Amino acid sequence: MIKRRKTREIDVGGVKIGGDNPVVVQSMTDTKTHNIEETLSQIKRLADAGCEIIRVAVPTEKDAEALKEIVKRSPIPVIADIHFSPRIAFTALESGIHGIRLNPGNINDEGKIREILQECKKKNITVRLGVNSGSLEMGILEKYGFPSGEALAESALNWSEFFEKVGFTKFKVSIKGSDVLQNIEANKIFAEKTDIPLHIGITEAGPAGRGSVKSAVGLGILLYMGIGDTVRVSLTADPEEEVKVAYQILQSLGLRRRGIEIVSCPTCGRIEVNLPEVVRKVEEKLDGKNIPIKVAIMGCVVNAIGEAREADIGLACGNKSAILFKKGEPVKRVSEDQMIDQLLKEIDNLEI
């Protein structure tokens, strides 16, 4: 059982973060935000996939002006992602957004940041304080020589202290870099010194395959340590894939459960069916079903039922047939050409 770090509770548009609340899954649109219909269409798809908070890029005034309509019609809370421009931040704050992401390292004006925080407090808007390895303050870079974990943590702690000194406490912090060990170290240092909620992620993780592995390693370690109140898996891929991978990581640690979990054996010389193809077909048929069960698809009967005893239902495939089992107990033998249909039928009949 993972003992999660105790953090203060905040909310973003009604979504509770920190405290005793579950880890929240976030993503970010890849549309031009001023293309309102396209952006909303993607937000709705992401919400259907399980995304609970969405961030949108706001690089221009045109994007900031589009936020009002997007916020009004979005099914989930919207965070405006602001870099460099306090002016755009103020425009965004007038739109009704639920949260704003600020990177003090590239705004670089304490007076303007103070004004933004005062406006956020007045409007009850949550802030995500983002510290990134690519935009550390020059003084910290000179002190450490490079964006080490200690450097990132110090920047985040300094800015957190600044936020609290101006009377603003409704914020969470993200400390991100593309280096996994650097990320872990920075978040660990920060987590040991504050009760501020942490948004975790490996930035610029890469394409879907490599990026998923990198994110699973980095986020998995942090989550196992109890660190992380919200999470985003950053991939060079469809944002819906980010949400899917995020839930898979959380599910593997027992922190969240969404959809059907499929477990299958790695195959060996004993198998007598095309197991990868069977698994692919089952996965395809079950995609989108939000039933909290575990399905096992095993390639032979040698250890299948014993190894997959924790599965709710499964197949142990053999020569031209398979044993269908539930909770580790054989139910019936089915023919190879009927085994997938029989499995799906039994899943539909399960009482959850």
From Swiss-Prot:
<comment type="pathway">
    <text>Isoprenoid biosynthesis; isopentenyl diphosphate biosynthesis via DXP pathway; isopentenyl diphosphate from 1-deoxy-D-xylulose 5-phosphate: step 5/6.</text>
</comment>
<keyword id="KW-0411">Iron-sulfur</keyword>
<dbReference type="GO" id="GO:0046429">
    <property type="term" value="F:4-hydroxy-3-methylbut-2-en-1-yl diphosphate synthase activity (ferredoxin)"/>
</dbReference>
<dbReference type="InterPro" id="IPR045854">
    <property type="entry name" value="NO2/SO3_Rdtase_4Fe4S_sf"/>
</dbReference>
<dbReference type="InterPro" id="IPR004588">
    <property type="entry name" value="IspG_bac-typ"/>
</dbReference>
<dbReference type="GO" id="GO:0141197">
    <property type="term" value="F:4-hydroxy-3-methylbut-2-enyl-diphosphate synthase activity (flavodoxin)"/>
</dbReference>
<dbReference type="Pfam" id="PF04551">
    <property type="entry name" value="GcpE"/>
</dbReference>
<dbReference type="GO" id="GO:0051539">
    <property type="term" value="F:4 iron, 4 sulfur cluster binding"/>
</dbReference>
<dbReference type="GO" id="GO:0016114">
    <property type="term" value="P:terpenoid biosynthetic process"/>
</dbReference>
<keyword id="KW-0414">Isoprene biosynthesis</keyword>
<dbReference type="InterPro" id="IPR036849">
    <property type="entry name" value="Enolase-like_C_sf"/>
</dbReference>
<feature type="binding site">
    <location>
        <position position="268"/>
    </location>
    <ligand>
        <name>[4Fe-4S] cluster</name>
    </ligand>
</feature>
<keyword id="KW-0004">4Fe-4S</keyword>
<comment type="function">
    <text>Converts 2C-methyl-D-erythritol 2,4-cyclodiphosphate (ME-2,4cPP) into 1-hydroxy-2-methyl-2-(E)-butenyl 4-diphosphate.</text>
</comment>
<comment type="similarity">
    <text>Belongs to the IspG family.</text>
</comment>
<dbReference type="GO" id="GO:0005506">
    <property type="term" value="F:iron ion binding"/>
</dbReference>
<dbReference type="GO" id="GO:0019288">
    <property type="term" value="P:isopentenyl diphosphate biosynthetic process, methylerythritol 4-phosphate pathway"/>
</dbReference>
<feature type="binding site">
    <location>
        <position position="300"/>
    </location>
    <ligand>
        <name>[4Fe-4S] cluster</name>
    </ligand>
</feature>
<dbReference type="InterPro" id="IPR016425">
    <property type="entry name" value="IspG_bac"/>
</dbReference>
<dbReference type="InterPro" id="IPR011005">
    <property type="entry name" value="Dihydropteroate_synth-like_sf"/>
</dbReference>
<protein>
    <recommendedName>
        <fullName>4-hydroxy-3-methylbut-2-en-1-yl diphosphate synthase (flavodoxin)</fullName>
        <ecNumber>1.17.7.3</ecNumber>
    </recommendedName>
</protein>
<feature type="binding site">
    <location>
        <position position="307"/>
    </location>
    <ligand>
        <name>[4Fe-4S] cluster</name>
    </ligand>
</feature>
<keyword id="KW-0408">Iron</keyword>
<keyword id="KW-0479">Metal-binding</keyword>
<keyword id="KW-0560">Oxidoreductase</keyword>
<feature type="binding site">
    <location>
        <position position="265"/>
    </location>
    <ligand>
        <name>[4Fe-4S] cluster</name>
    </ligand>
</feature>
